[in-house]
């Protein structure tokens, strides 16, 4: 264990040194300054409130989404495919995956709700009043309490949402559609091209034929989830999991329907 911690410290230190030029540029860029000013308006704005983080798993097809119409909600990545049938739009939309953003650029350009994207996405998404740039990284494990600084992506956009929700002050965060299970198998983070309808998400065209995407890294995402659970607990807040049939075991489970008044 001490050796593992030592190796992780050395790796994190090396990552930090390698990130310095990029992080310095990001910190000095006027687009980031303007974005951070907008981000600060969200800090603790929803203190004491609850929110739902909507994953994109197939379980959404067995989840009564109509119940969320008057709730604070985080949508992720290509949830806009569900907007027509939802009858409402989520409070926020979050995406930090380059492949998703690049291949869905027209959709993201048309988003009018508050949009949170990685700093890397500036090459496709120029500044706009509803767009917020997050300086996210693949390495350097951490939970960012202040999202105007660096966030670790934790191998899943859900982890970015958990950091955003904490920054915004939400006291109870409820996960739905976070199935934590994929029919498509392979090496974590490997980029593949979909050969047909998508069996891993709520819509067959989510990562439909010809779409490039990266295979999930569920182990790394669990590292992030454990960090999030601890930070929320230490702050007297909670994350619970109401995913229908989900395989994630990090957070306490709750039956989705029990969260709403009859």
Where do the model's predicted regions map?
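Metal-ion/cofactor- or nucleotide/acyl-coenzyme-handling active-site neighborhoods
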Residues: 2-262
């Amino acid at each position: 264990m001490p050796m593992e911690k030592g190796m992780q410290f050395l790796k994190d230190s090396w990552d930090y040194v390698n990130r310095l030029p990029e992080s310095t540029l990001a910190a000095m860029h006027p687009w980031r300054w303007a974005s951070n000013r907008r981000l600060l308006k969200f800090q603790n704005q929803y203190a004491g409130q609850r929110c739902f983080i909507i994953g994109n798993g197939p379980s959404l097809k067995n989840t009564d989404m109509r119940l969320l119409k008057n709730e604070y909600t985080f949508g992720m990545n290509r949830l806009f495919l569900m907007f027509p049938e939802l009858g409402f739009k989520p409070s926020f939309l979050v995406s930090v995956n380059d492949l998703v953003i690049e291949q869905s650029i027209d959709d993201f350009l048309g988003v009018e709700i508050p949009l949170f994207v990685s700093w890397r996405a500036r090459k496709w998404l120029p500044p706009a009043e509803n767009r917020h740039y997050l300086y996210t990284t693949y390495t350097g494990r951490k939970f960012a309490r202040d999202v105007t600084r660096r966030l670790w992506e934790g191998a899943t956009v859900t982890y970015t949402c958990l950091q955003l929700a904490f920054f915004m002050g939400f006291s109870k965060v409820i996960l739905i559609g976070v199935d934590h299970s994929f029919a498509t198998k392979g090496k974590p983070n490997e980029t593949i091209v979909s050969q047909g309808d998508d069996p891993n998400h709520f819509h067959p065209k989510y990562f439909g034929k010809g779409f490039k995407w990266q295979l999930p890294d569920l182990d790394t995402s669990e590292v992030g989830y454990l960090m999030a659970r601890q930070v929320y607990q230490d702050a007297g807040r909670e994350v619970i999991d109401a995913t229908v049939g989900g395989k994630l075991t990090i957070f306490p489970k709750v039956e989705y329907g029990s969260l709403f008044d009859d």
